[in-house]
Design a protein with these regions (language model features):
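Extracytoplasmic metal-acquisition and chelation regions
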Residues: 4-7, 16-281
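Hydrophobic core
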Residues: 12-14
Length: 281
């Protein structure tokens, strides 16, 4: 992954002129390191916060590079919603600061270093509650609003959890093959077995041996669909699918959305895609 490289003087100047500013027009400044965090912050913060997403819509967030202006915004923010280890450039800026709200530390992470904790609706419920507490500590005047909205989003996430549970009942298979290993939390929550063609890095090129291993696994387990992601080249997934006579379909890690989509709508499509691919009742 690439890391942010800024002249030392620029960083020092940004820090000096920007530290401590926590509100804009009476609203709390919240920086989100990627779309899922921005969605959560907006749902919980509502009209009492200004949320800025560091990643442009439709862009791949893993290798985000920060401009000097973004570095200053991170340093000024009251709260920065992020996931330690997911985006090294963001981690670098947050070192030594107390404004970071690390989802991984709040909800607990699996041991395989998969950063996609937000794909588990139950963990996102805990993240919403914790974020409300953090915002309330920074802005006690609006504490009741933060906690009420966190309760509402937790209810919506509970409904999403039910959607997945229902969709994945009575399935002919529990094995999924994905273009990269982004779905560990989803698999863990709903008792699926994930096999990623690539590892945790979405743009990593798998070796021919790895492709052959995954194809063998897919044949042995009766996999009929190879999943790829909307932000990743589907070439390798299509190669494996062609080799075993399978179909391809999108399974979205919700790293970014376009149009009228949001976290909930994309996740509901994921549930339907899995339901179809796994031959569920």
């Amino acid at each position: 992954m690439r890391r942010t490289a800024l002249p030392l003087l620029a960083v020092l100047l940004l820090s000096a002129c920007g530290s401590g500013s926590a509100a804009t027009g009476g609203k709390l400044e919240v920086i989100a390191a990627a779309y899922p965090f921005a969605w959560l912050a907006q749902q919980v913060g509502g009209p009492d916060v200004v949320v800025t997403d560091l990643v442009k819509a439709g862009a791949e967030p893993h290798d985000v590079e920060l401009t000097p202006r973004q570095v200053g915004a991170v340093q000024r923010a009251a709260v920065v919603v992020h996931l330690k280890g997911f985006q090294p450039a963001v981690d670098d800026v947050l070192q030594g600061g107390g404004q970071g709200y690390d989802l991984g530390a709040v909800v607990g992470q699996l041991p395989d270093k998969d950063p996609h904790v937000w794909l588990d609706p139950v963990r996102m419920q805990a993240a919403a509650t914790g974020l409300a507490d953090r915002l309330a500590a920074k802005d006690p005047k609006h504490a009741a609003g933060y906690r009420a909205r966190a309760k509402a989003v937790a209810t919506a996430l509970g409904a999403l959890d039910t959607t997945f549970t229902t969709a994945l009942t009575g399935c002919a298979r529990r094995d999924i093959v994905t273009s990269h290993s982004a779905f560990g939390y989803l698999a863990d929550r709903y008792n699926l077995v994930q096999r990623g063609i690539s590892g945790l890095t979405p743009d990593a090129e798998p070796s021919p041996r790895r492709v052959a291993e995954v194809a063998k696994f897919a044949k042995a387990t009766g996999v009929t669909t190879i999943f790829f992601e909307s932000l990743v080249d589907p070439k390798v997934a299509r190669t494996v699918a062609a080799e075993i006579g399978a179909k391809t379909a999108v399974l979205d890690p919700v790293e970014g959305v376009t149009g009228d989509d949001d976290y909930l709508s994309v996740q509901r499509r994921n549930a339907q895609a899995l339901h179809t691919a796994l031959g569920c009742a």
